[in-house]
Amino acid sequence: MSLRRQPDFEQFLKVLLRSGKPDHLPFYEHYASPEFVAERTGTNIDKMGYSDPGYWDIYVDFWLGMGYDCIPMEIPLKCPLGEGHGAASEGSESLAMIRNWKDYENYPWPDESNPIEFEHFDTVAKLIPEGVKIVGGVCMGPYEWTSQLMGVMGMSYALIDEPGLVDAVFEKIGSLIHSTDKQLGTMDAIGALRQGDDLGFKTSTFLKPELLRQYVFPTYKKIVEEAHKNGKPFILHSCGNLAAVYDDIIDDCKVDAKHSFEDAIMPVGEFKKQYGKRITPLGGLDVDVICRATLDDLRAYTRKQIEACFYDGFWALGTGNSLTDYMPVENYIAVLEEGIKVTS
């Protein structure tokens, strides 16, 4: 079923900036797995790469066909990761690329003037119709890149044995991300900048708050400033229990909107009660509920979340994490249908 509606990014902007109740309930997701997109579109996009003909046409149509006002999009840094099964798994020690200063010096760092493949943003900019904007940024944030390049254990040991090396890796990654957002922020087709960077798990952050303040948040602050300098809001997607650092994220980094919520940590409705006057929550419907609930129960659950979060207009409907390859497409469509029906 097509959920196409007249796209209007200005309505999503009202949500992000908390500047007025939008005319419709916007939708937002940080990520959709290639398998989910393939199932929804009836294509083989899950077997395609960014540079394959038609890839971005399918990707853009996927979001527009579900009633989105924006195209969520991220491209990774040109920083090679260790090859092998599980190379993208956080903290895979056997695939760590930087264990010492020699590794750091020999690593093929990209030129800071061209740290990502910007041409993909140019391609999507030509595909989007009037009323639609890209919400874009770098795939993975400073914590995720550093923990993958060094390995979680390797980084942890280095914090004690070789803190200067940890400083250098975080500084380099931060500079590359900052350079990217400095350029993306000037693109007319981009309506907001975003960063995904999973900082924690169910009970706490991976790094102590003081280490996040030392290594991670300075980069957040710089890239948020780039967004604001260009009159654009900034979205942070970060999983985990971040209660110890929400004040840093909101007041120091000045992030405009937060995505990624889990009922077991803090339901999005509770987050809105505590922080909603200072930052906009996005999404938050529990992925497990979406995957397992009957359609009737799922529609009721969706209505409950809308009532809890959209009463003032400052929220966008979506999952608490992402569109996974194991999520039934029809269940997610039921969520969006309910969002359109309840708020039309």
Q: At which residue positions do the language-model features occur?
A:
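Conserved alpha-helical segments that form or flank metal/cofactor-binding pockets of metalloenzymes
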Residues: 76-83
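Active-site loop segments of alpha/beta catalytic cores
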Residues: 1-37, 41-48, 52-58, 69-73, ...
